[in-house]
């Protein structure tokens, strides 16, 4: 019998060991910081194709996530004059009800992707939506302005768990040929959420007062979270990474900031978005005073240009 047939499988040659490692059929090294606690094997990703039932469920679920996230963020913008009167604060101070939310949102987005690698994509997005919606229900019950601001800041911190993680989920699960379509559906949810959150709350405020209007947006967020939980399929291609690998993420962030062109892109986006939000923050004060004297629902309609 040829000598190569007499070799034991338990003691492969160097060539065999290299071939085996390339196929990744053996467990990952225990001292690998990115190794999973479970045995992982490298397999071809199972993409979700456009037109399939799973694709439709994902599209609807992430549309709801985008809608809820941005309606909760921006629903206070038309209410800033009302909040200034109720809490006896000036226009600049009242704008903190939105500025703190968006500021903490930006901070949370930097961390959300890393956290989701340890907790799971769907779980983090669902928890973020539920907690933020509950905070939006609590906010109108508060009589202290600073407590109101704390709740709004926490709301932004929680909502940061949706935008970055939603994109990561889509990139992992959707067929690359249909990824642009799936991301477009999610982004349309954010745009419609930001618009309707501003417009709907204006009509609700005229009918029921700002307390009920703001609480209603929180209830709507919980309904969206329920639909998200039911519709979004479990991840197929996600590989959990235990712990928070801070050094890995610090290197990634440093790479973005030291890039020759990216910091300028970041600054352009920050300044453009800052100007956009600031104009809409203060236009309500001008339109609610003489000589215009517009109602909350009329002020809300101004945001249709958004």
Annotate each PLM feature.
Residues 83-84, 115-116, 200-208, 288:
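Interfacial helix-cap and linker-helix signal at transmembrane-aqueous boundaries
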Residues 43-52, 233-266:
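Juxtamembrane intracellular "pre-TM" segments in multi-pass secondary transporters
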Residues 107-145:
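Conserved MFS/SLC helix-loop-helix module at the cytosolic interface between two early adjacent transmembrane helices
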Residues 151-190:
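Cytoplasmic helix-loop-helix junction between adjacent transmembrane helices
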Residues 147, 176, 185-232:
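Helix-loop-helix hairpin linking two adjacent transmembrane segments in secondary transporters
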Residues 74, 102-110, 194-195, 306:
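Residue-level signature of mid-helix packing/kink "hotspots" within the transmembrane helices
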Residues 57-91, 112, 279-285:
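Extracytoplasmic
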Residues 144-152, 265:
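Short hydrophobic/alpha-helical segments at membrane-entry points of transmembrane helices
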